[in-house]
Amino acid sequence: MIKQRTLKQSIKVTGVGLHSGEKVTLTLRPAMPNTGVVYYRTDLNPAVAFPADPNSVRDTMLCTALINEQGVRISTVEHLNAALAGLGIDNIIIEVDAPEIPIMDGSASPFIYLLLDAGIEEQNAAKKFIRIKQYVRVEDGDKWAEFKPYNGFRLDFTIDFDHPAIGKDVRNYEMNFSAQAFVHQISRARTFGFMKDIEYLQSQGLVLGGSLDNAIVLDDYRILNEDGLRFKDELVRHKMLDAIGDLYMAGYNIIGDFKAYKSGHGLNNKLLRAVLANQEAWEFVTFEDKAQVPQGYVAPVQVLI
């Protein structure tokens, strides 16, 4: 049987909030089988829970934010969510003493190290996957995202920015998902932004924690980071990282073929909602026999960094 996974022990880290610029403490805790991914804001009394749910994503302007019925929000969940998807963690309690998850270095890599440091253990319950059964597509102007049936999790993402530093050869990335592929090819790709947008946002009291330490920053001509890029196509890889985090907002790893053009948090969420709203388009599956599992999900609990 392919089993659900949680952490072996709790672990804590501090970082900076991207929007507030304030110190944020993040605590990750093990959870019982079938708990799912649950975010908690512990700075509120009583603490407010945000179970990962695509219908709770009500703001995708600059990040993915979960907002409850009372208007309480928790922001910038997508990079941590991507790390959970990457390692196939089904059950976890995430506590944060602020309205946002710390930005760390702008990628999912620090969260991967944190999760592996806590240790991953299997639980005595079958892991559920969402298997795509029908073609589903959503569009927004010239942007689109789609799912097709496929026995694995394949991703194909294309960006299109009219910028001299983003050539045609670095606008597309394709990958067959596995924990190993995610850790090595995707998790280190950092978020990016354009100087003119950042200056405006900071004048509005946003992205106050944004810096060259936690983002790739571009002016009108070039990349401003002294050390350059981690991959020549780091920008499109980061967009794929975002998509993996956004699509894990259902709390289950997906078996299907995902393809997107210029998609962002909003369209990724719209696609996930469209799939789940159509009961003919998907099904829950579990695997009693490891031989039946799609190749990318036959992942060992130990991932080599």
From Swiss-Prot:
Biological pathway: Glycolipid biosynthesis; lipid IV(A) biosynthesis; lipid IV(A) from (3R)-3-hydroxytetradecanoyl-[acyl-carrier-protein] and UDP-N-acetyl-alpha-D-glucosamine: step 2/6
Key words of the record: Hydrolase, Lipid A biosynthesis, Lipid biosynthesis, Lipid metabolism, Metal-binding, Zinc
Record-linked SUPFAM superfamilies: Ribosomal protein S5 domain 2-like
Enzyme class: hydrolase
Binding-site list for Zn(2+): H79, H238, D242
Top-rank lineage group of the source organism: Bacteria
CC cofactor: Zn(2+)
Cellular component per GO, a single term: membrane
EC id: 3.5.1.108
One GO-annotated biological process of the protein: lipid A biosynthetic process
Its job: Catalyzes the hydrolysis of UDP-3-O-myristoyl-N-acetylglucosamine to form UDP-3-O-myristoylglucosamine and acetate, the committed step in lipid A biosynthesis.
Protein family membership: Belongs to the LpxC family.
The protein's name in its UniProt record: UDP-3-O-acyl-N-acetylglucosamine deacetylase
Organism: Haemophilus influenzae (strain ATCC 51907 / DSM 11121 / KW20 / Rd)
Gene expressing this chain: lpxC
